[in-house]
Structures are given as C-alpha cells and as structure tokens.
Amino acid sequence: MLKIKALFSKKKPDQADLSQESKKPFKGKTRSSGTNNKDVSQITSSPKKSFQDKNIVQYPSVVADDHHMKSLTDELVTTIDSDSSPSDNITTENVETVTSVPAIDVHESSEGQLSSDPLISDESLSEQSEIISDIQDDSTDDDNMEDEIPEKSFLEQKELIGYKLINKIGEGAFSKVFRAIPAKNSSNEFLTKNYKAVAIKVIKKADLSSINGDHRKKDKGKDSTKTSSRDQVLKEVALHKTVSAGCSQIVAFIDFQETDSYYYIIQELLTGGEIFGEIVRLTYFSEDLSRHVIKQLALAVKHMHSLGVVHRDIKPENLLFEPIEFTRSIKPKLRKSDDPQTKADEGIFTPGVGGGGIGIVKLADFGLSKQIFSKNTKTPCGTVGYTAPEVVKDEHYSMKVDMWGIGCVLYTMLCGFPPFYDEKIDTLTEKISRGEYTFLKPWWDEISAGAKNAVAKLLELEPSKRYDIDQFLDDPWLNTFDCLPKEGESSQKKAGTSERRHPHKKQFQLFQRDSSLLFSPAAVAMRDAFDIGNAVKRTEEDRMGTRGGLGSLAEDEELEDSYSGAQGDEQLEQNMFQLTLDTSTILQRRKKVQENDVGPTIPISATIRE
C-alpha cells in the first residue's frame, strides 16, 4: 500500500497543504487531454476570445475530411462490447450522429466580439477590448509555424498522414503525445486554416495488445467478456467527438487515424496547461478567478449532461486553459493567512476575460466518461479525493457524481488544498463516504458565506439534495463579481487597484513559467493524494472482476503510471516528503528534501487516457 506521510500543525490532519507556495512562473506548458508535459514554446492553437456564455468562439470539432472516422465508427456499431450494461453502449443511432456532425463555421463569431454581460462595467469592457486587440496583434507570430523543423525523427511519423510531428510533449504508459502541425501539402483547407498546431496522442497497438493479454491470463477460467483494446479506443473517440461538437468549454476533437501499428487521436492544443499547475503556482484562487474557472467547467458539464454523458473524473488536472496577458496589481489583496513574501500576485481580474493569466478554460480527458442517458450506471471510477460518496460505497449513481467533482474542484481552488485527504486510503474513502470535510481555519476565515454555501450544496452527501447543474449555474454567488464596484462605490477606486502592462509582442509569452514547480514535492503529493488512491481502488476492483466498460483501458494505464515504473512501496515512501499545513513554501520544502538526499521526487503520474 502506498502511503503519504503528513505532519500537521495545530490543524486537523484532514487536508494536504498546498498553501503558501513560492511562485516562480513557468514556461509554456502544453497539455492535451491529460498528460505529463515537457516545456514547449508558446504557440497559438486557436483564436483567443473573451469568455462569455453567448459570445464565445465555437471551436470546430470535426475536420472536413471525415473519412478516417467513417469506417471506424460504422464498425463500432457492431463491435460495442456485449458485456456492458445497456447504459454502457453507444447505440447505432448515436454513432451515426457522431459521424455526421458538421464542422462549425468559425466565422459566425467575429474576432473582436465583446461581452454583453450586464455585470461588466464600461471600464471592464474597455480593458477587455484592449486585451482582445493585443491577442489579435500577437496572432501573427504563428504565421510561419508550418516551417518549424522537428526536433528529431519520430518513428510515429512514418504512418501518420497529413500532420508533421514537431516535438514530444508528454508520455503515458501506452501512449506518447506530440505537438504537431498540419502538413504543407494537406488537402484539408479547414484544418490548415483553423489550427496552427494540434496535439496528437499516439497509442501503439502492440502495447495495448500486451496489456489486454495479461488481463486475459488473470481472468482465465472466468467468464470474461472484456472488450478489446480497439473497441475501447473507438468508444473514447466516439464520445469525445460527440461531446466536443458545439461546446467551446470542451477540448475539441479534430481527427482520428488508425494504421497498422498506431492509433492517432488528434485534438486541440491548449498552451496554458492544467489548472492544477496554476493552483500550485498561485497557492489558491480569488473568488472571482474561482468563479471564472468553475463556471466554464459547469457549462462543459451542462453540455455533456444534455447529451446523456457523465464525465466521472472531474479534477484540476483535467481542466486546461488558454493563457491571457497578466496585469499586475498595484496592491495585491492578501488574506491574513498569506505570507506576503511568497504569495504570488494573481493580478487584475476582468469579468468575461479572466485573471492570473487564465483565460478560456476547457474540460479534457474522456477516458472514463460514459453515456448513461436516463439510466443509472454502476462502474466505480474516478479519482479518490474527488469521487462522490455513492461511488465509493459502490451504489447506483448518475449525473450528480459530476456535481460532487465540481464541488471538490471549487473547494480546492478557493483554499489551495482538497476537501478530503488522509495518508491512509481506507480512511480517505471512509471520509468521502461520510462526507466528512470542514472549512478549515484560518484558510477559510476570509472566504465569503456565498462561496461556502455553493461548496456545501455541491458536496451534499445525499445525491437527491445535491445541486444539479442548472441549480449551480443559478447560484447567486456564481453570478456576481467582487471586482465590480458595489452600489454607491466609485469605479475609480476599483480602477486604481491595478496597473496594466503593455509588453512588446515578443514579451507576450506571459509568465516565463518554470515547469519544475509542477514536479516539486508538494505538487507531486497533491496529485498522488488522489491518483494513487484511485489506482489502488481500481486494482481491488480488478481482482474482483468488477471493472469494465468504457473506462477499462484508461484505468489500466493510470494504474501503471501511478506506480512510476513499479517502484516498491519502500522506495516510494523514501521519496515522499511530509505534508504540512504551515507557512513553508513548496520550494523551501523541496530544498529540504534535496539537502536530506532522499532521492528524486516521484514523477507525476500521467493523466492521459488511452
């Protein structure tokens, strides 16, 4: 059993400390649908827009040449796993719908469209206009991207059609993720016009066949009807294609290719990276920035639920974002629990645009998603720590599971650490089953009653009493902004709290982020607090023969990655650092670990789904 040691100072030992982090900005992290990433140069993969419910760019979900998917999805109709319950299946009707989704006309939304939100002041609109202008000016930086030279020759390039692999940006247990650009000779004008760069997840068939063969050996003598790895890949592709069509808060599905040796899943490339990394960098989010992120997540979930699809693995690692220009605060607002020497400035927040460098936010990773329609589903999945009580207790559950996940993400953004934590997995799952969390002092002392109420409604133990997606979107707290002048308050007072920077285009690389921050001991421990527990839980389910359905393949992979090359428990314990809820920073703790020469930190487990 993997363990994470914890020390707690004067506070309940319920929560992992992710407050008071040293804030070194990091370089262009890029991620596609969940993966470990290497530094890549900042690029623009899609037009950047202000975020609004109505005036939002509708990213194209399907390229014009749909012949790659046609034969595969036709075949999928007859290859859906027979062992799944009716709720597991993607019906013939739905698969046909997937293949016929038209490409979205990106010209329907103009480049300079501004927010029509009545909550936004004239000053905010003016600033929003300036930011959009800056973004448009910067877009020319990518004009010569097709001339980029790959950093090396990749074996995966040989069978890939229409794209040029530039560099590897991530790697999972059975896949690699590449940044790529459309080939110069591509006949697909829609693709080359609307996507300067893409992310391609490459899955090697031989690796999947090997892991499925191992499972068959384990299940020998049992009535096993596990679907083939190919079926599982096609299911994930079909669901991703379905849910991303027409929703700008979901990472766009672009293309899919199958060759003799590989599966290629081509999808939108977001240059900001994971929201998880921003929580680590900023320690926590202001209520305004938390609203900005969580509302976009809620809109993505609303779209999925309207299609009868439940995500089942909502967490900060599965939220990606497009960066915006950072505007420094003249007098950063600090909480009493903050250390002014280490708390990073979140900067000015602009309603409808964002803040802290975070603009448009999108939901990724559909490896555990399931189409349930109006029926309940009973396949335990997700990440322990963000998993709803009814899932932990192996009860029937439906779309309210995603609302629990939204609540955990909101809690984490507001204070910097998750609502449920314990060094022992069995204790953690018991806490989740009982809904045992607290608004821990002093971190929650200055968070508004409205925010606490929203979290409480989302983390309601009884699913029937828990917010549904429409109730959450109507919550009063979600539909206000602290940065806007209150009634009778001068707008000049608010405008004077920050100063805007107008950097040269080449300085529009935002924060020059330091990727090492994401591999610091505290960040690793935060991920492992959820991912390791989830992997252990799924291992137990696998022994009982209860796993299956759409998420099976993803579960195999995450389990493999979480153990980081099958290190022994003893070695893992030596590499882990001690969590503490004091004011020490991530980098200070990391320095102590290095000075003690306890060995390298555990690599962050890959969250990409294969």
From Swiss-Prot:
Biased composition (Polar residues): 31-55
Residues forming the catalytic site: D313 (proton acceptor)
Biased composition (Basic and acidic residues): 11-24
InterPro entries (alphabetical): Kinase-like_dom_sf, Prot_kinase_dom, Protein_kinase_ATP_BS, Ser/Thr_kinase_AS
Cellular localization per UniProt: Cytoplasm
Residues that bear Phosphoserine: S46, S50, S187, S520
GO cellular-component term (any): cytoplasm
Post-translational modification (record): Autophosphorylated. Phosphorylated by HOG1 at Ser-520 after osmotic stress.
Broad class of enzyme this protein falls into: transferase
SMART domains per the UniProt record, alphabetical: S_TKc
Catalytic reactions of this protein: L-seryl-[protein] + ATP = O-phospho-L-seryl-[protein] + ADP + H(+); L-threonyl-[protein] + ATP = O-phospho-L-threonyl-[protein] + ADP + H(+)
GO molecular function: ATP binding; calmodulin binding; protein kinase activity; protein serine kinase activity; protein serine/threonine kinase activity
Chain segments carrying region Calmodulin-binding: 493-506
Region of interest called Disordered, as start-end residue ranges on this chain: 1-55, 99-127, 541-564
Modified residues (Phosphothreonine): T350
Protein EC: 2.7.11.1
UniProt keyword annotations, A-Z: ATP-binding, Calmodulin-binding, Cytoplasm, Kinase, Nucleotide-binding, Phosphoprotein, Serine/threonine-protein kinase, Transferase
Residues annotated to bind ATP: I169, G170, E171, G172, A173, F174, S175, K176, V177, K201
CDD domains: STKc_RCK1-like (cd14096)
One Pfam family hit: Pkinase
Described purpose of this protein according to its UniProt entry: Serine/threonine-protein kinase involved in a signal transduction pathway that is activated by changes in the osmolarity of the extracellular environment.
Family assignment from sequence similarity: Belongs to the protein kinase superfamily. CAMK Ser/Thr protein kinase family. CaMK subfamily.
Stated name of the protein: Serine/threonine-protein kinase RCK2
Gene designation: RCK2
